[in-house]
Design a protein with these regions (language model features):
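N-proximal low-complexity "stem/linker" segments adjacent to membrane-targeting elements
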Residues: 1-30
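Short loop->beta transition adjacent to catalytic acidic/histidine clusters or analogous donor-positioning motifs
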Residues: 6-9, 30-41, 49, 61-65
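Acidic helix N-cap motif at the loop->helix transition within catalytic regions
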Residues: 20-23, 48-56, 99, 103
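A conserved acidic beta->alpha catalytic loop
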Residues: 28, 43-52, 71, 95
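Glycine-rich, basic loop-to-helix element that forms the pyrophosphate-binding segment
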Residues: 69-86
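Conserved nucleotide-sugar donor-binding catalytic segment
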Residues: 84, 139-216, 224
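Short aromatic/hydrophobic "clamp" motif used to bind/position activated sugar donors
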Residues: 91
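Conserved donor NDP-sugar-binding/catalytic core segment of glycosyltransferases
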Residues: 103-133
Length: 253
């Protein structure tokens, strides 16, 4: 590919104490078949050596930019810093313990070039050693606000979104499910998001990670419906039941 004829894509990766996995995550970006990207790694005051590992990676590839925050701000605010600094036409988010397949950006850009401002993809589940542990989560080819109430099919590491949309709607760190709140806000502005049914992301389930704390997540989900999305009690109850049922199917069946 000739990078001069291809739009720049900004990859935003927050990092906090990512010693075990951040280099693998970065390599999955550097190995993309689509080469015209910048990778912004926002380090949120890591206490391990992961900032140094990222800086070493940046020395060998000038597409990597490292932003070291002076104060710990949390993952949502770290993402916001990267989004604000983005120079690309599109933004793709990647958590520092997840991995992309090498054609992720290329395939999602192809969808975006057809007019999609919000793109997502299917993904599978791996353990800490990259072993597959569950059947893949295959996403629908389209979703919207009402469908996302019942089943959240977009995750941070699968997202590929027009930069102007992301910069106009930053993550809200007041809510536990800040990513879900953002997708719903975007779907109120841009009614349809488009999914690639091919698995393009490996979602690593790490022991003790926030995403694995299901009981707390369930409590906060109700708070998200009522306070963030301002849904009435009946709609919130319907959405919560569907959320719980789909969560069981996604993570346990």
């Amino acid at each position: 590919m000739e990078t001069t004829k291809q739009p720049l894509i900004t990859v935003v990766m927050p990092n906090y104490n990512g010693h075990r996995f951040v280099e693998q995550a970065i390599d999955s970006v550097l190995n993309q078949t689509y080469p015209n990207f910048e990778l912004l790694v926002v380090d949120d005051c890591s206490k391990d050596d992961s900032l140094q590992l990222v800086q070493q990676k940046a020395q060998s590839d000038d597409r990597i930019r490292v932003i070291a925050l002076e104060h710990n701000a949390g993952v949502a605010n770290a993402r916001n810093v990267g989004i604000k600094e983005a120079k690309g036409e599109f933004i793709a988010l990647l958590d520092n313990d997840d991995l992309w397949t090498e054609d992720k950006l290329e395939r999602q850009l192809a969808l975006a070039n057809k007019g999609a401002d919000i793109v997502y993809c299917s993904y599978d589940f791996t353990d800490e050693q990259n072993n597959s542990i569950k059947k893949p989560f295959i996403v629908p080819q389209q979703t919207n606000f009402n469908k996302m109430l019942a089943s959240s099919v977009i995750s941070c590491s699968t997202s590929f979104i027009k930069t102007e949309l992301m910069q106009a709607h930053p993550f809200n760190s007041d809510f536990y499910h800040e990513d879900y709140v953002l997708w719903m806000e975007l779907l109120r502005v841009c009614p349809t998001a488009y999914g690639d049914p091919k698995v393009l992301m490996h979602y690593r389930q790490v022991t003790g990670s926030r995403s694995n704390k299901k009981s707390n997540a369930a409590k906060e989900r109700w708070n998200t419906y009522r306070k963030a999305l301002k849904l009435n009690a009946v709609t919130s109850a319907w959405a919560f039941v569907r959320y719980a049922a789909n969560g069981v199917m996604k993570y346990y069946l």
